[in-house]
Swiss-Prot record:
Family from the record: Belongs to the QueC family.
Gene3D superfamilies referenced in this protein's UniProt entry, alphabetically: HUPs
Source organism per UniProt: Caldicellulosiruptor saccharolyticus (strain ATCC 43494 / DSM 8903 / Tp8T 6331)
Protein name (record): 7-cyano-7-deazaguanine synthase
Protein task: Catalyzes the ATP-dependent conversion of 7-carboxy-7-deazaguanine (CDG) to 7-cyano-7-deazaguanine (preQ(0)).
Amino acid sequence: MRAVVVLSGGMDSTTLLYDVKNQGYETYTISFLYGQKHSKELEFAKKTCELLKVPHKIVDISFFADLAPSALTKSSWSVPEGYYTDESMKQTVVPNRNMVFLSLATSYAISLKAQKLFYGAHAGDHPIYPDCRKEFVEAMKRSILLCDYQIVELEAPYVDLKKEDILKIGLKLGVDYSLTWSCYKGGEKACGRCGTCTERIEAFRKIGVKDPIEYEIEIDWDQKT
C-alpha cells in the first residue's frame, strides 16, 4: 500500500514519516517552498529522506507568500517570541496554508495511486492554527474523498496528541531528531525563543531528554515545565 507524507522537516512530520514507514507503507514525501523566510527545514527534510531512502518531492509555490502574508513569509514582519497561546503568535499563521498543501499533496498521491495521505497536525497547534484543528482535518477528509475518482484517505494520527507524546513515539521509532529543524528563524542554531522552539524545548524537558540540536541560548534541560 502506498502513502504520501507531507514533510516539513520539523519534529512532528519527521516522526510521522518514520511512523508511516514503520507500518510497512511504500512511502513518498512531499515538501513545499511557499515563500518562507528560510528553507532550513527542507534541508533537514532532504537529509531524513536520504537516510530513510524514501522519495522526496519539493514543490515550489513561492508565489503563495504574496497571497498569504505572515511573519513567516514577510521580511518586514518580526517573528514573535513566546508561547503559542500568546496573542502575538497569530502573526505566524500563514492563511489557508494547510488546505493548499493538502490539495497539492492529494494530486501527488493520486498520480502515484497512493491510498493514504498523512500530515502531522497535533494538539499543540490547535490554539493558534485553525488548519491544524480536528474540525479542519475532518472537513478535508471529506473533501479529498470527493475530489477524484480515486480514493485517497487523509490521516492525521497525531491530531489529539501533545508534542511530548509525539516525541515519545519518535524516540521508540529511533527518530534522529538532530536531523529536524523547528525554529522559525533560519540561523546557524535554533533561537530558543520563538513559538516552535519554546514548544520543542518544553516537550524534551517534559520527558527528561536533552534535545540533540544546538540553541543560541543556554537551556536548562533539567527544568520541569
